[in-house]
Amino acid sequence: MSRRCAITGKGPMVGNNVSHANNKTKRRFLPNLRTIRVTLEDGTTRKIKVAASTLRTMKKQSN
């Protein structure tokens, strides 16, 4: 199971946890994925994982 947006390809990023003493340990920033239903041209329905930022953009462009 890949944590990747089906439309934009947005995936995990790598960064650091930084403590108060400035110690750094690696961590991953995961995209905010949402499962949505999409109706294809042939009438079938599929579930895809889409980032929340992609959903906002799609909603903005549909108006």
Swiss-Prot record:
Matching InterPro entries: Bacterial_rp_bL28, Ribosomal_bL28, Ribosomal_bL28/bL31-like_sf, Ribosomal_bL28_bact-type, Ribosomal_bL28_sf
Assigned GO CC terms: ribonucleoprotein complex; ribosome
Signal peptide: none
UniProt-recorded Gene Ontology molecular function terms: structural constituent of ribosome
Keywords assigned by UniProt, alphabetized: Ribonucleoprotein, Ribosomal protein
Keyword match Plastid: no
Region: Disordered, residue numbers: 1-20
Acetylation keyword on record: no
Pfam family for this entry, one: Ribosomal_L28
An example Gene Ontology biological process: translation
Gene3D superfamilies the UniProt entry points to: 2.20.150.30, Ribosomal protein L28/L24
PANTHER family: 50S RIBOSOMAL PROTEIN L28, LARGE RIBOSOMAL SUBUNIT PROTEIN BL28A
Family according to the record: Belongs to the bacterial ribosomal protein bL28 family.
Protein name: Large ribosomal subunit protein bL28
Organism of origin: Campylobacter curvus (strain 525.92)
Gene name, Swiss-Prot/TrEMBL: rpmB
